[in-house]
Amino acid sequence: MQIILLEKVANLGQLGDVVNVKNGFARNFLIPQGKAKRATEANLKEFDARRAELEAKQAEILADAKVRAEKLNEAVITIAQKAGVDGRLFGSVTNVDVAEAVTAFGVQIKRHEVRLPNGPFKAIGEYDIEIALHHDVVTPIKIVVVGEA
């Protein structure tokens, strides 16, 4: 299926690109999330008319991501979890827990923006992770997991 991208999509293309994707990917993911439209003549004309508006919106989203990245740059976030005497956690620290801790720190992020390269944290310690606020804006932070009494 040919689609027009309404925003930058990783490993696919930039705003305004007409690309071929599998039907299910377009119908179930890209179109419902507003990332793309079918590449019909009417949609191509509508996109050309709205191109400047969409580019301005994407520039605003990128600027907002850069501002949030400045606030988070090299931040150290502490998360307290119940742990055993050997330093292993009862449960784990997931991307949801990290997103809540960063939001409490003062920067609003969503759970899908948190990148945990080795999966959830299962032990007390310091972990370096990345927060992907935008495709082009990724900022490193340090998570310190401490045990609760």
Swiss-Prot record:
In the record, biological process GO terms are: translation
What GO MF terms are annotated? rRNA binding; structural constituent of ribosome
Q: Which cysteines bridge via disulfide bonds? A: none
Record-linked PROSITE patterns:
RIBOSOMAL_L9 (PS00651)
Q: Which InterPro entries match?
A: Ribosomal_bL9 (IPR000244), Ribosomal_bL9/RNase_H1_N (IPR009027), Ribosomal_bL9_bac/chp (IPR020594), Ribosomal_bL9_C (IPR020069), Ribosomal_bL9_C_sf (IPR036791), Ribosomal_bL9_N (IPR020070), Ribosomal_bL9_N_sf (IPR036935)
Instruction: Kindly give the Gene3D superfamilies that the UniProt entry links to this protein.
Output: Ribosomal protein L9, C-terminal domain (3.10.430.100), Ribosomal protein L9, N-terminal domain (3.40.5.10)
* Keywords from the UniProt entry: Ribonucleoprotein, Ribosomal protein, RNA-binding, rRNA-binding
Q: Which domain of life is it from?
A: Bacteria
Q: Name one GO cellular component term.
A: ribonucleoprotein complex
Which family does the record claim for this protein? Belongs to the bacterial ribosomal protein bL9 family.
Looking up HAMAP family in the UniProt record yields: Ribosomal_bL9 (MF_00503)
**What function is annotated for this protein?**
Binds to the 23S rRNA.
This chain's protein is named Large ribosomal subunit protein bL9
